[in-house]
């Protein structure tokens, strides 16, 4: 079995993490994985865990990506994969058009994974054109059927993003060396009720909503401290600056720590008091919240999307009607 995955880059983010974990898991089972992307910091780990990486800039929303269709077609003819797996819209268009240009008898099976609630338009419709369409949650399946009704329901498979129970379990604890390094880097976190908000620094993630939560917990005498794990995309730093200004106006700057991109999120989740999901609109799945739950750590999040599906199994119904700071006080 041989699978070619198309993804914009291997820099950071949920889709990239899924591709890396798919590659690692499938490679360990003897499946040959080839990831085509514009590269990034995750490539060395991807290759170390058994996948092959081919550098090809197929993630930019520009005419230049269309010029890669011929190269992708040639790659598919040379590699002859059993499955072509499309993970994101721009690479999906390039990959789909390259796939269509192959003789029907030479085409691999076409799989798309819908990792998010994309804007509803013809551009996003490409993600519903797989011969099999993977939905990462029940709500994503509903989204596909509601907005792209031409998708045959029997083409859709619900396959939630998974975690390894060997890596994420309640008995897990970071090493003494890691803990020493963590508190040396962030001594302000010692003895605090730490609220971890992981993910890219984008408006969608709801950082502004975290400010009143921290302030109100502090007013109640709880030593709350926010730990924001993630970074803004290059050229997209203005939103982070907006959040920093709002934090300063609220007078809680000393209760926020920004770590930037980290490779040790498991250790951070297991060390923080609670993990939050404050996405402004429904999120397809919510990998970090599932990881925190598997580690036995409390999670609080807005009741929508894939995170709601997770929390419905863990959080008493009465809690869903509490305001954010009241819910956290119960935790």
Positions of the model-derived regions?
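A conserved mid-protein helix/loop that constitutes part of the nucleotide-sugar donor-binding site
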Residues: 13-21, 193, 197-218, 238, ...
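Carbohydrate-associated surface elements
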Residues: 139, 162
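Glycosyltransferase donor-sugar binding loop
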Residues: 36-41, 198, 225-241
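Conserved small/polar residues in nucleotide/adenosyl-binding loops
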Residues: 320-330
